[in-house]
């Protein structure tokens, strides 16, 4: 073989036509036309998305949402922030169970009682004065005077009073006068106890002898959670939680700073 000439490789014979795979062509129905959607402005109807953020809510809902966001974003002073720490569910259930026994009478019950008493008097059976049963006392002014006179055994305050200024002083007053207090969820729930729509606060003044043990247990648990922790509660600020946009912006700036520092050092 002369130098400089390369030997040519043998060519492989092409595969027979039988061995070739016949790709099945997709049968396209000419009646079905392709109509790609255009989601530009003024074109096709937009796909379903979660547009909750853009809904024009009723005014009262808008205020609720704004208030909750402001409480997260702004720095909330301890006096207001303490109302976010409600009583735990188990203790609250026991408390409401006991409070249910001391609900004040309704207008219908009072009418029925007075009618029975009047009938008794008319029958000539005499009108002996009856002892007032122990019931819950409700309302800020009533409870303030009870606490000041140290007549309240336990004060229950609602966490969602609006405006909060109505009850903001009560925890400090209760602690000063040595009265056990607690914060529970729901002014509406307290309202149901005293036959009203809502109620800012209720207080126990007297209880029946059979319930004194249950009340003493509750008072002990509540004192541990609220009265004894007053100094800790007084120092604890709330809020200051940034939103997702602000957090993302801060993270982006920090990444850029870290990158810049790395290039300077490297």
UniProtKB/Swiss-Prot annotation:
PROSITE patterns, alphabetized: RIBOSOMAL_L7AE
Gene3D superfamilies given in the database record: 3.30.1330.30
Region annotation (Disordered) ranges: 1-28, 105-134
UniProt keyword list: Cytoplasm, Ribonucleoprotein, Ribosomal protein
Molecular function GO labels: RNA binding
Biased composition (Basic residues): 1-11
Chief place of localization: cytoplasm
Annotated Gene Ontology cellular component terms: cytoplasm; ribonucleoprotein complex; ribosome
GO biological process, one term: ribosome biogenesis
Family: Belongs to the eukaryotic ribosomal protein eL8 family.
Subunit structure: Component of the large ribosomal subunit.
Role according to the record: Component of the large ribosomal subunit. The ribosome is a large ribonucleoprotein complex responsible for the synthesis of proteins in the cell.
Name of the protein: Large ribosomal subunit protein eL8
Origin species: Takifugu rubripes (Japanese pufferfish)
Recorded name of the encoding gene: rpl7a
């Amino acid at each position: 073989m002369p130098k400089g000439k390369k030997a040519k490789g043998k060519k492989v014979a092409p595969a027979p036509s039988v061995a070739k795979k016949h790709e099945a062509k997709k049968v396209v129905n000419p009646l079905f036309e392709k109509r790609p959607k255009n989601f530009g402005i003024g074109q096709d109807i937009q796909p379903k998305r979660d547009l909750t953020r853009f809904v024009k809510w009723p005014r009262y809902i808008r205020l609720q949402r704004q208030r909750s966001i402001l409480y997260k974003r702004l720095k909330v002073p301890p006096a207001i922030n303490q109302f976010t720490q409600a009583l735990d569910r188990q203790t609250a259930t026991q408390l409401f169970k006991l409070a249910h026994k001391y609900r004040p009478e309704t207008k219908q019950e009072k009418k029925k009682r007075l009618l029975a008493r009047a009938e008794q008097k008319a029958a000539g059976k005499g009108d002996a004065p009856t002892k007032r049963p122990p019931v819950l006392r409700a309302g800020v002014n009533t409870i303030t005077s009870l606490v000041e006179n140290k007549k309240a055994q336990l004060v229950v305050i609602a966490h969602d009073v609006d405006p909060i200024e109505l009850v903001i002083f009560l925890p400090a007053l209760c602690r000063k006068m040595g009265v056990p207090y607690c914060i529970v969820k729901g002014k509406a729930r307290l309202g149901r106890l005293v036959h009203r729509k809502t109620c800012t606060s209720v207080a126990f003044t007297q209880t029946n002898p059979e319930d004194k043990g249950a009340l003493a247990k509750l008072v002990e648990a509540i004192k541990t959670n609220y009265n004894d922790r007053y100094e800790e509660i007084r120092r604890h600020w709330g809020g200051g939680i940034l939103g997702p946009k602000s957090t993302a912006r801060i993270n982006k700036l920090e990444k850029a700073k870290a990158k810049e520092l790395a290039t300077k050092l490297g």
